[in-house]
Amino acid sequence: LKEKRLAEKQRQKKYLMQQLLTGKKRLPGFSGQWEIKDFNQVFAFGVTNTFSRECMCEDSTGVKNIHYGDILVRYGEVLKLSEQEIPSLLSDIGAKITTFVEDGDVVIADTAEDLTAGKAVEVQETHGKKVAAGLHTMLCKPIKDCFAPGWLGYYMNSETYHKQLVPYIAGVKVMSISKGNIVKTHILMPPIEEQAAIAEVLSTADREIELLQQDIEQEKQKKKALMQLLLTGIVRVKT
């Protein structure tokens, strides 16, 4: 039953993203045209590193490192460092990093095994932690005070934005997109108050999905523990 509810919540979020991030459906109280900005009008590129997994560890201190594989598999649209632990670079390697990710920056995975290349995360709640953009990523630093927290993370993972990327994603065994091509895309820019309202709706949907996933995982662990007890004879079924 909970799995069905989870699937339904995920469908609802997808529908909300399709409607709200394109301007097809407007939230109450908002009207007027959205601006369309060229990528270069919105972002400047920051420096990334090329360190592999072997240069990373699960240490809670040190320079955090956003690896493209984690963007593709582990992280959602908005990566809040106050809520999610991410790997660190080994201390001697972390000492070499001079460019850091700030709140509101977008980190894009430029490489994948399929058309998921271009998946992005918006980083929030760094709270003074040093964070680097890692292997096969683009670090995109937006112009200040034009975007509400969460807007770019949700918009740049929407179908409407990803469709712009698809013609430029190239490769045979490995697919990738270049900086030279990603700058040919454009970004939709509603008024900042509307961005904030949309991001809040989608963030609420994310929280509901996350709570259901946690419930499902806890039930699985309980069943697994009970099976172990039954199989070892520690607990016997009453007959």
Model regions: which residues?
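Short, ligand-facing micro-motifs at secondary-structure edges
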Residues: 72-85, 106-133, 150-154, 163-167
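Non-catalytic DNA-recognition/assembly elements of restriction-modification systems
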Residues: 27-50, 184
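Active-site/binding-pocket entry motifs
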Residues: 45, 71-74, 114, 146, ...
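A short glycine-rich beta-alpha junction/loop motif
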Residues: 53, 129-138, 147, 162, ...
